[in-house]
């Protein structure tokens, strides 16, 4: 777009280098190429190693929580070495640098989690004392809520690494996002899909977000061509809900918004890490009020749980 030369690079995407992150970046690139009728090769992809990729020996909530998978990419964006970033929405902090924003989300993939185990057909089929490996506090807490007789431990790594760890017995089972398996062509690895009414997904799960500089009119117009309005509405409710709670990785939080025409249905949950204390709420309302409904749901749960609920786990 800086030149009429058909071989010039139009824009550079910044992304993590994991297979899933690269699959997401290529999906964005291909959609942009179709929307603007240009060769995909004219949109470059630059991989950036993040803190979350480098630190594999500790749980995320012990080393900074959210932002670990975006910080270095945002730094490249602000420095101008990339034109926009592609993220998994659930990795994006609720508060962005002042100079950046999320101008577009791709159409949302399946939001559900999946149960994976070589030993059992479902979470309920695992024997007492079996170990479920997951680095997600939300998943750990919900496993313990449903099956307090199970053990949970941290299982880090990209999708393929976690699948390998399960296959060699580092845990009896794990939980992953179905969206990630679908994007990698690994959906056949799912033992059982967990419905949202029993296992509420993470805020933003299944949605690919594009982050750009607010003042870059050229790039903002470029990426908005592939934005999905329904996903944007759903994420506005979910992210406003998260922003008013503990938006780090220290408090297990689930949230999911469904968009039905000009109406939305939202469900939100906060839960203690051991699964014994939880608060849930729902909201229905106009699509135009999505952000306000998410915020209202958060205010209700914060009031019901009390500040002690959040301060107790902030230091956990």
Swiss-Prot record:
Pfam families: Porphobil_deam, Porphobil_deamC. Pathway: Porphyrin-containing compound metabolism; protoporphyrin-IX biosynthesis; coproporphyrinogen-III from 5-aminolevulinate: step 2/4. Its EC number is 2.5.1.61. Transmembrane segments: none annotated. The modification S-(dipyrrolylmethanemethyl)cysteine is found at residue 249. InterPro entries: HemC, Porphobilin_deaminase_cofac_BS, Porphobilin_deaminase_N, Porphobilinogen_deaminase_C, Porphobilinogen_deaminase_C_sf. PROSITE patterns: PORPHOBILINOGEN_DEAM. GO terms for molecular function: hydroxymethylbilane synthase activity. Binds 1 dipyrromethane group covalently. Its cofactor is dipyrromethane. One of its GO terms (biological process) is protoporphyrinogen IX biosynthetic process. Keywords: Porphyrin biosynthesis, Transferase. It catalyses: 4 porphobilinogen + H2O = hydroxymethylbilane + 4 NH4(+). It is an enzyme of class 2 (transferase). Disulfide bonds: none annotated. The keyword Lyase does not apply. The porphobilinogen subunits are added to the dipyrromethane group. Belongs to the HMBS family. NCBIfam families: hemC. Tetrapolymerization of the monopyrrole PBG into the hydroxymethylbilane pre-uroporphyrinogen in several discrete steps. Monomer. This is Porphobilinogen deaminase. It comes from Nitrobacter winogradskyi (strain ATCC 25391 / DSM 10237 / CIP 104748 / NCIMB 11846 / Nb-255). The gene is hemC.
């Amino acid at each position: 777009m800086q030149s009429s030369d058909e071989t010039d690079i139009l824009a550079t995407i910044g992304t993590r280098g994991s297979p899933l992150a690269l699959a997401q970046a290529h999906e964005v690139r291909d959609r942009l190429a179709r929307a603007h009728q240009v060769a995909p090769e004219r949109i470059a992809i630059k991989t950036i190693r993040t803190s979350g990729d480098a630190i594999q020996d500790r749980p995320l909530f012990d080393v900074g929580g959210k932002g670990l998978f975006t910080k270095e990419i945002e730094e490249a964006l602000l420095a101008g070495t990339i034109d926009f970033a592609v993220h998994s929405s659930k990795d994006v902090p609720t508060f962005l640098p002042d100079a950046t924003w999320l101008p577009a989300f791709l159409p949302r993939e399946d939001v559900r989690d999946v149960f994976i185990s070589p030993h059992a057909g479902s979470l309920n089929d695992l024997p007492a004392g079996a170990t479920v490996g997951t680095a997600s506090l939300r998943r750990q807490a919900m496993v313990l809520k449903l099956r307090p007789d199970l053990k949970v431990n941290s299982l880090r790594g990209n999708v393929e690494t976690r699948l390998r760890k399960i296959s060699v017995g580092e845990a009896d089972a794990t939980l992953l996002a179905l969206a990630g398996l679908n994007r990698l062509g690994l959906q056949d690895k799912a033992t059982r899909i967990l419905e949202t009414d029993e296992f509420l997904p993470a805020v933003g799960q299944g949605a690919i977000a594009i982050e750009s500089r607010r003042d870059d009119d050229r790039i903002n117009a470029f990426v908005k061509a592939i934005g999905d309005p329904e996903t944007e509405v759903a994420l506005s409710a979910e992210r406003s809900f998260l922003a008013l709670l503990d938006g780090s990785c220290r408090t297990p939080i689930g949230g999911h918004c469904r968009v039905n025409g000009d109406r939305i249905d939202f469900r939100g949950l906060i839960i203690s890490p051991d699964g014994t204390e939880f608060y849930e709420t729902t909201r229905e309302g106009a699509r135009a009020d999505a952000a306000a409904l998410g915020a209202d749901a958060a205010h209700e749960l914060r009031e019901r749980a009390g500040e002690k609920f959040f301060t107790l786990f902030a230091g956990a």
